[in-house]
Design a protein with these regions (language model features):
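Glycine-rich, basic loop-to-helix element that forms the pyrophosphate-binding segment
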Residues: 60-77
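Short, acidic, metal-binding catalytic loop of nucleotide-sugar glycosyltransferases
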Residues: 21-30
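Conserved donor NDP-sugar-binding/catalytic core segment of glycosyltransferases
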Residues: 94-133
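A recurrent flexible, glycine/aromatic-enriched loop bordering the glycosyltransferase active site
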Residues: 145-169
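A conserved acidic beta->alpha catalytic loop
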Residues: 36-45, 62
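The conserved acidic donor/metal-binding loop of glycosyltransferases
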Residues: 86-90
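Short aromatic/hydrophobic "clamp" motif used to bind/position activated sugar donors
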Residues: 82
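N-proximal low-complexity "stem/linker" segments adjacent to membrane-targeting elements
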Residues: 1-22
């Protein structure tokens, strides 16, 4: 299945670079819709200089907010299945495969996320410290953890809506009561 990932960003350039690199580590050809939401931290220049034929770039000079750009990203994405990520998220191995196996029409599939211990625990996440700042991420430890725990959590599901998520594009517009 072909999938597009939408990643809006507001003043998170260095986190966005980590997000982009984590996706490209596992998925070289997946379509990305990367959105600069009026950032003032040189995200615009980074996006302009990004050489990747599988990236649709939306470079807004005006801040419009994530919700606006979720919709715009959906409109620009060329694939039937679309995921939304925050610009400070990184993915582990098999992220796409593990979320797609639960995807059905009319459903939103949210992935379990790992957050540092400054955030409260919740059933939708694992609290672990792999670094907070874009400079101190322990990516090798994160990948090792994902690989070791993938079997333990492979059939664990929870109810709720939280990022990152994947759904059929038409379902997004149906939820929004939007005809595109």
């Amino acid at each position: 299945m072909k999938i597009s990932l939408i990643i809006p960003s507001y003043n998170t350039k260095y986190h966005l670079i980590n997000t982009y690199n984590s996706i490209r580590k596992y998925y070289k050809d997946i379509e990305l819709v990367i959105i600069n939401d009026g950032s003032t931290d040189n995200t615009s220049e980074w996006l302009d200089n990004l050489k990747d034929n599988n990236v649709i770039k939306i470079n807004s000079k005006e801040r419009k907010g994530h919700t606006f750009f979720y919709d715009e990203g959906m409109r620009q994405a060329t694939n039937e299945i679309v995921g939304i990520m925050h610009s400070d998220m990184i993915i582990g191995p098999n992220y796409i495969e593990n979320t797609l196996k639960y995807l059905e029409r009319g459903k939103v599939v949210c992935a379990t996320r790992i957050e540092p211990p400054i955030h409260p625990a919740g059933k939708e996440k694992i609290v672990m410290d792999f670094g907070m700042d874009h400079n101190d991420l322990k990516l090798d430890e994160f990948e090792k953890f994902c690989n070791e725990k993938s079997n333990e959590f492979k059939d664990v599901t929870t109810k709720g809506i939280f990022a990152p998520w994947i759904l059929y594009k038409e379902d997004h517009f149906a939820i929004r009561n939007d005809t595109k």
